[in-house]
């Protein structure tokens, strides 16, 4: 262990099929983190000056470690399982930023300033369906932990494919924790950092700020 989490303020777990998605997506890395770094993780999230983000495979890891949704390290309260389509999906999807989200990563992305709270990002996964018991889903909704939802062309959350690429319950594409300092999402915002990276960038007009975070 050459480094210690106490020396850092941000833990970022990117996408990328850790350990080849053996067993299930994110499982092995999650087991390693909870087996060898549970104490460090607990101390890390207890600090007030830390942030954690997990994208795609990173979101799967955060779910399987128990960091999301309820910060219960070693306890899984939800899962990200096989897409309803039965195959890997790589496509652009439309998302709505939840206006009541407490996630600090979204602090400057208010509805009025960010294309009316609608964004487009790529998804690229085979196991992205957010699934949990009803009482867990109800708690997530009650505590405003949802950050992003898949939406249709009318801007409404949807369960229909392909707008919802995996069949996630309540069209959930991303969630945060009760502090708002941990964010996990299946879509890839890092693939859209310049407006020109969107396939319709010449046709679509965006408000100041743009989904590309320029």
Positions of the model-derived regions?
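N-terminal cofactor/phosphate-binding cores enriched in small/glycine residues
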Residues: 1, 5-21
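Short beta-strand segments
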Residues: 12-14, 54-56, 122-124, 186
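Acidic active-site catalytic centers that drive phospho-/nucleotidyl reactions
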Residues: 9, 60, 190
């Amino acid at each position: 262990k050459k480094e210690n989490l106490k020396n850092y303020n941000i833990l970022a777990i990117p996408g990328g099929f850790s350990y080849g998605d053996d067993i299930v997506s994110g499982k092995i890395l999650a087991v390693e983190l909870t087996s060898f770094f549970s104490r460090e993780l607990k101390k890390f999230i207890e600090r007030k000056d830390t942030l954690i983000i997990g994208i795609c495979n990173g979101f799967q890891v955060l779910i399987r470690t128990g960091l999301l949704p309820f910060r219960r390290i070693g306890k899984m309260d939800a899962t990200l399982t096989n897409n309803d389509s039965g195959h890997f999906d790589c496509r652009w999807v439309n998302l709505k930023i939840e206006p009541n989200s407490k996630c600090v990563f979204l602090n400057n992305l208010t509805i009025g300033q960010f294309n009316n709270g609608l964004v487009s990002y790529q998804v690229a996964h085979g196991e992205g369906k957010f699934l949990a018991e009803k009482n867990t889903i109800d708690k997530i909704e009650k505590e405003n932990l949802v950050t992003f939802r898949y939406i249709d062309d009318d801007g409404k959350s949807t369960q229909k494919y392909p707008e919802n690429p995996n069949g996630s319950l309540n069209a959930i594409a991303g969630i945060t924790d009760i502090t708002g300092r941990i964010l996990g999402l299946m879509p890839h915002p890092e693939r859209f950092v310049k407006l020109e990276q969107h396939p319709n960038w010449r046709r679509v007009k965006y408000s100041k700020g743009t989904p590309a975070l320029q």
